[in-house]
Curated annotation (Swiss-Prot):
Residues engaged in binding Mg(2+) 2: D1346, D1427, D1428
Motif extent (Bipartite nuclear localization signal): 1178-1212
Protein name: Transposon Ty1-JR1 Gag-Pol polyprotein
InterPro entries reported in the protein's UniProt record: Aspartic_peptidase_AS (IPR001969), DNA/RNA_pol_sf (IPR043502), Integrase_cat-core (IPR001584), Retrotran_Ty1/copia-like (IPR039537), RNaseH-like_sf (IPR012337), RNaseH_sf (IPR036397), RVT_2 (IPR013103), TYA (IPR015820)
E.C. number(s) listed in UniProt: 3.4.23.-, 2.7.7.49, 2.7.7.7, 3.1.26.4
Keywords: Aspartyl protease, ATP-binding, Cytoplasm, DNA integration, DNA recombination, DNA-binding, DNA-directed DNA polymerase, Endonuclease, Hydrolase, Magnesium, Metal-binding, Multifunctional enzyme, Nuclease, Nucleotide-binding, Nucleotidyltransferase, Nucleus, Phosphoprotein, Protease, RNA-binding, RNA-directed DNA polymerase, Transferase, Transposable element, Transposition, Viral release from host cell, Virion maturation, Zinc, Zinc-finger
Length: 1755
């Protein structure tokens, strides 16, 4: 029956939408990559032929191609694989049955009847249900029809009963393009409406009016398929049909939604283009309307940028808003938000002006009687405002020259502004409508604007000699009634009220200040171009900008009317209360305290709280009327804004009501804050606070940790305090559920004392609001106090304590009382209080000598709890003291530079406030030796030491005499010190101990040294201070560091007569004065330097006890000495033979050789920098110099040293910067191309292995779904930028396996196809070496893994195409990538993000901050290098667990599990490692070098004597003209790149002893002379001869409790081209060399000390980073040390002398090193030059010296 039915209706099959697809589903397992080109061409030809047959078939039998229909006839052509839909989505007999249509019988086809599709059929019945249309169906869409339109009628209006009918209905046009689909749908909907099917069309809500019948659904489906061929359907329509090929209703519904959206978009665009605004409606409503339109358009894909939006908005502004059109010139990139700020400001100004019209508007009669010849003028000496405006400017200028007390007569309208209004525009916004917050000025300062004035702007005046302004709110440092006479152009006087500074903050973030005069008697604010020119600012009227002489644009100029203006938004408003200008002669006795002063005095409390406190007498000594409150409302404290910045406030009323029924001190709230990071061990990291519910009295206690015993001690203390002081018993303590409160110890304590613990519910912070708000308030105050005072962060708890004292004394607005009053205590006497951080001078009652200064500069912290004194911080002594012997330092405000506090001098206010208290102190002073009470428990700084269990060092300190003589202790007799800002040093030694603050009476006697550095013509010599004597200045450091168990210094004292010295005269270069210094043996000098703290400035203390002082050896110093000796003992330093008595002592090493002939470019540099090279010039023996290399050495003859003159110009000299990393050198190509490995490879066996590797790679790519295998793209149809060339590379690995890799040519990838900001991270070599070293010391298992095809696990976001592999023979086709293919720019970054996410989320790892690709958890450390993983763990099962997790996602291979206890060999990132757990580790590259070096074509000498050193001292690179042809030059450069590339790779891996030679030769890669090549050959020869050398590590002693990280530094002064110095550093962890660096100094040093400072400063950042890494990977404490052989450098670093350095660059480096040493527990050691292994990094050494320095760590 089915076949008969098909044949019966075969004559109308042309009208169906059936596709010619086989009745069977085609199944194939054939890989698309294996399809040959011939088969593909046959398939395409067959498909083309079939399509042409269908095209030529008559209309009556034509069947459009549609893959969504099953054809009742078998197809004669196999389906194309590259169709618009995937093959598996094409309709088959088993897939064609639509849901709900089973009653039609056959499941393989959609039934249809003749009446549904025949154009001549009329259905039976009285009326025709479906329309008929002519046989010429399918007119193109471009053909207009009378019934087709661009709009459609809502289907709801159609007749649902379908009673009306049309005899003929014009069919819709044929769809010919996907872009025409929206218009076609409109005609199709019109066609359905005309066909009486309007009721089935979805309405605006997506639902039809009536239910569609089956016949109607069939008609709808078939007509849609006829007139909308599948190849022209949009993608979203195809997506719908791929799910349900009959769901035409969903397509219509989506189309209607899109048309509605398009209509809304069109309406929005029209509305936006026709905006109008004149202020008649609120600005908020206008902004909401505009922003909603813009947001809708952006969401719909129509992007409206800021420039277009601002233009559309400004075009519709009128009235007083019209002038905003011209603000576009001042902002090239104005945003919509900024424009609406302007509109809001004007709108608010309009509302304010309307509410106060009687105050500003003038009567109409006044306007008529107004005269322009008023006596007061506005323009001082103005001849022409803008020289460019010569025409039509006379009347405007004349108008500007006169003052009017009211508005001028209206003028005619022009293009630049709307018609003048009767109301002036008042602009009070301090940023010219842009800076947000308004400054409300008093009525006196308001001035009516002229009708031709641009509000909020300054008029540029080229003829005015002074700048005048009407408003006083932009005047800084104002002084009233200045004696200044100003006249206008008509010689008439202009009264001036004040003079001050006008400060600008331009758009290049620079600040400039000019003088300004204040007068309200002008019509414009005038900005003098002459004064701007004085500060290097000119006005360019061609570009309409203010700019500097170098062309830097500062601000735009706006042309308005006939004048030019600059916006006031660049003016900085004054942050202080402007003094009353007209009241100058105010009596001193009646002058009130300014509010900013009181605000800062009372811990930055708000004005309301302070006023309540003064009203209720909780603050005594003065009344509320004594404070000037005029500026309290508008005053903004910058420190409060920074320190108290919050997100939102806590929710109030969260506590239970019953808590109010408790008596005082019965109900407490407590909470713990912390930790505070990056603090010294002596400073607390936490504090615990308590608040009484009834009185709101607060207590705070410092904590170092949150242990149970620490918390219990605090609870015991506060309960005893409340019981004894207030006779109250605590009943309830409310706290959160932290472990510090819920532990069993505290719970038993509370239970024993009868106290009920009240815990908050989980995650209910609101129930703990009292304690939370207190902590927030105290922290706000703390940040503000530290910000205001500039004190270091380790004093943070002192700020908390100060704030607590003040907060307990301030009245609550609710209770009208302070916490002290509620508790029954007296109010706080403010005369006893100093601002936090107030500079003071503390009296030293026991100075070093009678001639030493008696004052020590300090900073007041807070009143003492235990005495009438004050807690004061002394930076020079690193102490806090409790004393009454201090005097306030006048004129010193410790402020930050970014705020203008220069004008905030409250000296007189502070003197008046503390006068009575100072007199009380003066009359009751007790001259006793214990005035400085250091044993009080005032705060944590005096009570807590680094190691309290160790005996305290009572050695005293000397006060540095560098400070100026302090003022007298009597305030009334002291003179005002010059007002320069003094800030507390932020970076000082924060370690505070309980040792004595002032020096003891026993002193060590040492001579005074004043001359530190000689700066003669040579700049060579530095007087070695530590040689002469141990500095007394070291006393300054000794007591503060005595408590450190890890300190590198000792406090031993030596007498000047302890040994017999011989005076040796030393003359400084270029000078005539001779210094007589004692000659000291090297051994004694070394001992003194290591155990002393040398300094630049030393003070000679008195010695009254004896001439011979025995060193004081306390247990602390002995412990320090043991620590020092243990660190030095761990280092691989050479063992020196006994020195000859003829050798000179070490001080002379600092003397560089004085030689009149010296080259500027050398491999060996100046040679040995020791003084004996110059003083006693000895030629080394032949065996020290010979290097037996049997290749050409014609150019290696030793040349006479040339003079120190700049090199002559050369025809070809190419010098590059020193090599910073291995990747900067062009690597050697070790891979083969496809033709080399397969096509032309004559080695059959090797070829077969490469072919096998080739197929293995292709199969792996297919397995990983690297590209889309369903479709191939024509090369001509793809954007060339997205096409990436591909290639196969082949190589043979060291294990003998042959590998093939199919890669993309990322080197020619277009920048638009990848994100340039993405980074491909790999593990840093220092991180790997650190991990290996820690593994050896901790007996870790080392497991090596490899992830196969790592990059292919990462998806690719971009649309990229590559050429198929060559075996497919599809050269003109492309395939689209789906994975991050090898070679792409973004592949590495994509893989890194993928594996990083997996390790963190699935493996429980976390990445170490600052060290990419280093992951850790509590048991395992992972170092990741692309697809290689190195796992370190003490438990091998932990490694296995990670491996199991990785195998779930990635193809993970275990290269080496590392479970054996015997020696295990690894090949990790090129390093050949031999590791025996718990014993040793050896790192080398013997196998790799044996394979690679012979391939370099270097003339090796395998039979001759081996080289003993990589280079010869004294040989210099001759930089004469290099004249070779271009081809030979390129060839030699290429050869140098290969040689230095390999040498760099080896050197930075483990051969750190070669880095100097590598770095020097790398600078000459582009200067390949014969001599440079020979030296390079010699370096490669030495590498070949020593290829079996290894970096040797031995396990650290198990008794060592700490990790020891040491950097050894050295520098060779002036031995590089252009007088640059070579610097080098070696880094050691627990005595194992883990890295090295040799480079040329970036700055030109003028002395050896500068070179050494440069070298040390280069090592400090890496030293700190390595320290952080070690602490993250291993939780043991760490000691950081610096070793150098320059005593003068150590003296400078440890000195406290802050005098100006000779060179600001090195002065900055020296000061930074001081901060590192004093603040970060970084210790500096002295090391003998002969033991300095970093010497190999800076100069070529003789063979014996080279071997001596390297044989202990590499052999």
């Amino acid at each position: 029956m089915e076949s008969q039915q098909l044949s019966q209706h075969s004559h109308i099959s042309h009208g169906s939408a059936c596709a010619s697809v086989t009745s069977k589903e085609v199944h194939t397992n054939q890989d698309p990559l294996d399809v040959s080109a011939s088969k593909t061409e046959e398939c395409e030809k067959a498909s083309t032929k079939a399509n042409s047959q269908q095209t030529t078939t008559p209309a009556s039998s034509a069947v459009p191609e549609n893959p969504h229909h099953a054809s009742p006839q078998p197809a004669s052509v196999p389906p194309p694989q590259n169709g618009p839909y995937p093959q598996q989505c094409m309709m088959t007999q088993n897939q064609a049955n639509p849901s709900g249509w089973s009653f039609y019988g056959h499941p393989s086809m959609i039934p249809y009847t003749p009446y549904q599709m025949s154009p001549m059929y009329f259905p039976p019945g009285p009326q025709s249900q479906f329309p008929q249309y002519p046989s010429s169906v399918g007119t193109p869409l471009s053909t207009p029809s009378p019934e087709s339109g661009n709009t459609f009628t809502d289907s709801s209006s159609a007749d649902s009963d379908m009673t009306s009918t049309k005899k003929y209905v014009r069919p819709p046009p044929m769809l010919t393009s996907p872009n025409d689909f929206p218009n076609w749908v409109k005609t199709y909907i019109k066609f359905l409406q005309n066909s009486n099917l309007g009721g089935i069309i979805p309405t605006v809500n997506g639902k039809p009016v009536r239910q569609i019948t089956d016949d109607e659904l069939t008609f709808l489906y078939n007509t849609f398929q006829i007139f909308a061929p599948s190849q022209f359907l949009p993608t979203w329509v195809k997506d719908i049909l791929s799910v349900d090929y009959t769901d035409i209703m969903k397509i219509l519904s989506k189309s209607i939604e899109k048309m509605q959206s398009d209509t809304q978009e069109a309406n929005d665009i029209v509305t936006l283009a026709n905006l109008q605004y004149n202020g008649s409606t609120p600005a908020d409503a206008f902004e909401t309307k505009v922003t909603n339109i813009i947001d809708r358009l952006n969401n719909n894909g129509i992007h409206i940028n800021n420039k277009v939006a601002c233009q559309l908005i400004m075009r519709g502004l009128s009235g007083e808003y019209k002038f905003l059109r011209y603000t576009r010139h001042r902002h090239l990139n104005m945003t919509v938000a900024e424009l609406f700020l302007d509109i809001h400001a004007i709108y608010e100004e309009q509302q304010g002006s309307r509410n106060s019209k009687p105050n500003y508007r003038r009567n109409l009669s006044d306007e008529k009687n107004d005269s322009r010849s008023y006596t007061n003028t506005t323009k001082p000496k103005v001849i022409a405002r803008n020289p460019q405006k010569t025409n039509n400017s006379k009347s405007k200028t004349a108008r500007a020259h006169n003052v009017s007390t009211s508005n001028n007569s209206p003028s005619t309208d022009n293009d630049s502004i709307s018609k003048s209004t009767t109301e002036p525009i008042q602009l009070n916004n301090k940023h010219d409508l842009h800076l947000g917050q308004e400054l409300t000025e008093s009525t006196v300062n308001h001035t009516n604007h002229s009708d031709d004035e641009l509000p909020g702007h300054l008029l540029l005046d080229s003829g005015a000699s002074r700048t005048l302004i009407r408003s006083a709110h932009h005047i800084h440092s104002a002084s009233s009634n200045p004696d200044i006479n100003v006249v206008d152009a008509q010689k008439r006087n202009i009264p001036i009220n004040a003079i001050g500074d006008l400060q600008f903050h331009f758009q290049d973030n620079t600040k400039t200040s000019i003088k300004v005069l204040h007068t309200p008697n002008i019509a414009y604010d005038l900005l003098s171009l002459n004064e701007l020119a004085a500060v290097d600012i000119t006005a360019c009227f061609t570009k309409n900008v203010l700019e500097r002489s170098d062309g830097t644009v500062l601000a735009p100029i706006v042309q308005y009317g006939d004048f030019y203006w600059v916006s006031k938004r660049y003016l900085l408003p004054s942050n202080i209360s402007v003094p009353t200008i007209n009241n100058v002669h105010t009596s001193e006795s009646t002058r009130k305290y300014p509010y900013p002063f009181i605000h800062r005095m009372l811990a930055h409390a708000n004005a309301q709280t302070i006023r309540y406190s003064l009203k209720n007498n909780t603050i005594t000594y003065f009344n509320e009327s004594d404070v000037d409150w005029s500026s309290a409302i508008d005053y903004q404290c910058p420190d409060c804004l920074i320190g108290k910045s919050t997100k939102h406030r806590h929710i109030k009323g969260s506590r239970l009501k019953y808590q109010n029924s408790y008596e005082p001190f019965q109900y407490l709230h407590t909470d713990i804050f912390g930790p505070v990071h990056n603090l010294p061990k002596s400073a607390p990291s936490y504090f615990i606070s308590f608040t009484d519910e009834t009185t709101k009295f607060r207590w705070v206690y410092p904590l170092h940790d949150r242990r149970e015993d620490s918390i219990l001690d605090v609870f015991t203390t506060i309960l005893a305090f409340i019981k004894n002081q207030f006779q109250a018993s605590v009943l309830v303590i409310q706290m959160d559920r932290g472990s510090e409160y819920t532990n069993r110890t505290l719970h038993k304590f509370l239970e024993k004392n009868g106290i009920t613990p009240c815990y908050t519910t989980t995650a209910d912070s609101r129930a703990h609001g009292v304690a939370e708000r207190l902590n927030r308030t105290l922290l706000d105050d703390c940040r503000t106090q530290l910000q205001c005072s500039g004190l270091p962060n380790h004093l943070w708890f002192s700020a908390i304590e100060f704030s607590t004292i003040v907060r307990n004394s301030l009245a609550s607005p609710k209770s009208k009382k302070s916490a002290r009053q509620h508790a029954g205590l007296a109010g706080l006497d403010i005369s006893t209080l100093l601002p936090f951080g107030q500079p003071v001078i503390v009296n030293d009652h026991n100075p070093n000598s009678k001639i030493h200064p008696r004052g020590i500069p300090g900073y007041a912290l807070h009143p003492s709890r235990n005495s009438y004194g004050y807690i004061i911080y002394l930076p020079s002594l690193k102490k806090t003291v409790d004393t009454t012997n201090y005097v306030i330092l006048q004129g010193k405000e410790s402020r930050l530079d970014q705020f203008n506090y220069d004008a905030l001098t409250f000296d007189e206010d502070l003197n008046r406030l503390t006068a009575s208290y100072q007199s009380f102190i003066a009359s009751n002073e007790i001259q006793e030796s214990n005035d400085l009470n250091i044993e009080s428990d005032h705060d944590f700084q005096s009570d807590i030491e680094l190691h309290p269990e160790q005996p305290r060092n009572v050695l005293s300190k000397a006060v540095s005499p560098t400070d100026s003589t302090p003022p007298s202790t009597h305030t009334e007799d002291s003179k005002r010190v010059s007002k320069t800002n003094i800030r507390a040093p932020r970076e000082v030694d924060p370690n505070i101990s309980e040792s004595n603050i002032l020096p003891s009476k026993k002193r060590s006697s040492t001579p005074q040294i004043s001359n530190i550095e000689s700066t003669g013509s040579g700049g060579m010599h530095k007087l070695n201070v530590p040689l002469l004597a141990p500095m007394s200045q070291s006393n300054t450091h000794e007591s503060s560091h005595a408590s450190k168990s890890k300190d590198f210094r000792h406090s031993d004292s030596y007498s000047e007569n302890e040994t017999n010295h011989t005076n040796v005269p030393i003359s400084s270069t270029g000078g005539t004065n001779n210094k007589t210094v004692p000659q000291i043996s090297d051994q004694e000098t070394e001992k003194r330097i290591i155990h002393r703290s040398p300094s630049i400035d030393a003070s000679p203390p008195e010695n009254n006890s004896s001439h011979n002082i025995v060193p004081i050896k306390t247990p602390t110093t002995v412990s320090e000495q043991n620590t020092e000796e243990s660190i030095i003992a761990d280092l691989p330093l050479p063992d020196l033979p006994p020195e000859s008595p003829t050798e000179f002592p070490d001080p002379f090493k600092e003397l560089p050789p004085i030689n009149s002939h010296q080259t500027n470019s050398s491999l060996g540099g100046i040679g040995d920098s020791n003084a004996y090279t110059t003083i006693n010039s000895k030629k080394r023996s032949l065996e020290d110099n010979e290097t037996e290399i049997k290749v050409s050495r014609d150019t290696w003859n030793t040349k006479n040293m040339r003079s120190l003159e700049p090199p002559r110009s050369k025809k070809r000299i190419h010098l590059i910067a020193a090599v910073k990393a291995v990747k900067s050198i062009k690597p050697i190509r070790t891979t083969l191309r496809y033709d080399e490995a397969i096509t032309y490879n004559k080695d059959i066996k090797e070829k077969e292995k490469y072919i096998e590797a080739y197929h293995k790679e292709v199969n792996q790519l297919l397995k990983m779904k690297t590209w889309d295998t369903d479709e191939y793209y024509d090369r001509k149809e793809i954007d060339p930028k997205r096409v990436i060339n591909s290639m196969f590379i082949f190589n043979k690995k060291r294990d003998g396996t042959h590998k093939a890799r199919f890669v993309a040519r990322g080197d020619i990838q277009h920048p638009d196809t990848y994100d340039t900001g993405m980074q491909s991270n790999t593990v840093h070599h220092y991180a790997l070496m650190t991990s290996l070293s820690l593994a050896l010391d901790n007996n870790y298992y080392i497991t090596q893994l490899d992830i196969s095809s790592a990059y292919l696990y990462a998806d690719i976001k971009e649309e990229l195409y590559i050429r198929p592999p060559p075996h497919l023979g599809m050269n003109d086709k492309l395939i689209r990538l789906k994975k991050s293919h090898y070679g792409l720019k973004q592949s590495g970054a994509n893989w890194y993000e993928t594996i990083k996410s997996y390790l963190i989320k699935q493996c429980g790892m976390e990445e170490v901050r600052g060290w990419s690709c280093v992951f850790k958890n509590s048991q395992v450390t992972i170092c990741l290098f692309v697809d290689d993983m190195i796992l370190f763990s003490k438990d091998l099962n932990a490694n296995k667990k990670i491996i199991t997790t990785l195998k779930k996602q990635y193809d993970t291979k275990i290269i080496n599990l590392g479970e054996s206890d015997n020696e295990i060999q690894y090949d990790i990132l090129g390093l050949e490692i031999k590791y025996q757990r718990g014993k040793y580790m050896k790192l080398g590259m013997e196998n790799s070098l044996t394979e690679k070096i012979p391939k370099l074509n270097v003339p090796l000498n395998p039979k001759g004597r081996k080289l003993s050193a990589p280079g010869q001292p004294g040989l210099y690179i001759d930089q004469d003209e290099l004249e070779i042809d271009e081809d030979e030059y390129k060839e030699k450069v290429h050869e140098m790149q290969k040689l230095i590339g390999l040498a760099s790779y080896v050197g930075y891996k483990f051969r750190f002893d070669l880095l100097y030679y590598i770095n020097t030769l790398a600078q000459h890669i582009l200067f390949p002379s014969r001599q440079v090549l020979d030296m390079t050959y010699e370096l490669i020869q030495f590498m070949w001869d020593t290829r079996d050398k290894q970096l040797i590590w031995h396990k650290n002693k198990p008794t060592e409790p700490d990790n020891k990280l040491v950097a050894i530094s050295d520098a060779s002064y002036g031995n590089q081209p252009y007088y640059k110095s070579q610097i080098g550093n070696i880094f050691l962890l627990n005595g194992k060399v883990i890295g090295g660096k040799s480079t040329k100094a970036s700055l030109t040093c003028t002395s050896t000390t500068e070179a050494e400072i440069h070298a040390i400063s280069e090592s400090v950042p890496l030293l700190n980073n390595l320290s952080y890494l070690i602490q993250e990977l291993n939780k043991k404490p760490i000691i950081k040390g610096l070793l150098t052989d320059s005593r003068s450098t150590i003296s400078i670093i440890k000195s406290t002398n802050e005098e100006k350095f000779r060179n600001r660059f090195f002065g900055t480096k020296a000061m930074r090193l001081r901060d590192e040493v004093s603040g970060n527990n970084l210790y500096v050691y002295y090391i003998e030059t002969k033991k300095n292994i970093a010497d190999v990094m800076t100069k070529p050494l003789p063979i014996k010296t080279f071997k001596l320095l390297t044989n202990k760590w590499i052999h």
